[in-house]
Amino acid sequence: MAKGPVSTSSDDELPFETQEPIAADERSFFGGQPQKPSAPNARAALPASLAGQEHYHGHRERLRDRFREQGDAALADYEILELLLFRLIPRRDTKPIAKALIERFGSLAGVFGAPQALLMEVKGVGEAVALDLKLISTVAHRTLKSELRTKQVLSSWSSVIQYCHAAMAHETREQFRILFLDKRNVLIADEVQGRGTVDHTPVYPREVVKRALELSATAMVLVHNHPSGDPTPSRADIDMTKVIIDAAKALDITVHDHIIIGKDGHVSLKGLKLI
């Protein structure tokens, strides 16, 4: 009979029994520190696998201490991600995984915006970890959206851009989204009306206006992304926007703007005086 709890995960199985201080350490970001060896030469007597475990647990505590005492400004992006991965992958050195994710996707935003299938292409990231990363991304998006619901959209334009960028900038396919507003310009609904290819998504002006009527919306903000990263509008983007504006105007529905989101910025068709 085992004397203590033993890992049952095939990915994380260890050739030794898990000690209680380590288990307590993994229950939270700021759990108790692992027990120190009782004798100066105790580390030297440890098996190689145990010595490696002790090393990265010490690294985890140092990283937690820096975050606790100095905040996120003291940590690089990969270290923030590493802190998170401590919880998702509790018995493995997560620094190489965090660095590989940042290298593959370019930034924290890129990691959290990446599709699950692409996340799982990174060595060390399985389905469970990829799903957890997408869950965290969803929480962030919903937080930003909830802030929009309490504000007048036109007077909180920076919040609109921040939300749209978080939701769409790292999508690998074009996505056409509409923010439906009431007569006070408060958000009624945020809906994705279409998903397409890497450089095109079908848009049906009649369906756009029909949905606005169903929601009793009196105004809209159109948004779509360019997976290439360049938010410069195409002639098709401009023409399609004008068709929607004309269809909506006939029913007293205002189109305030059409925003195009890229990885590193955005473009407003109204700001460019194209509509």
From Swiss-Prot:
SUPFAM superfamilies named in the record: JAB1/MPN domain, RuvA domain 2-like
CDD domains: MPN_DUF2466
Keywords linked to the UniProt accession: Hydrolase, Metal-binding, Metalloprotease, Protease, Zinc
Domain of life, source organism: Bacteria
Residues involved in Zn(2+) binding: H224, H226, D237
Gene Ontology terms: biological process: proteolysis
InterPro entries reported for this sequence: MPN, RadC_JAB, RuvA_2-like, UPF0758, UPF0758_CS, UPF0758_N
Entry's Gene Ontology molecular function annotations: metal ion binding; metallopeptidase activity
Protein name: UPF0758 protein RL2068
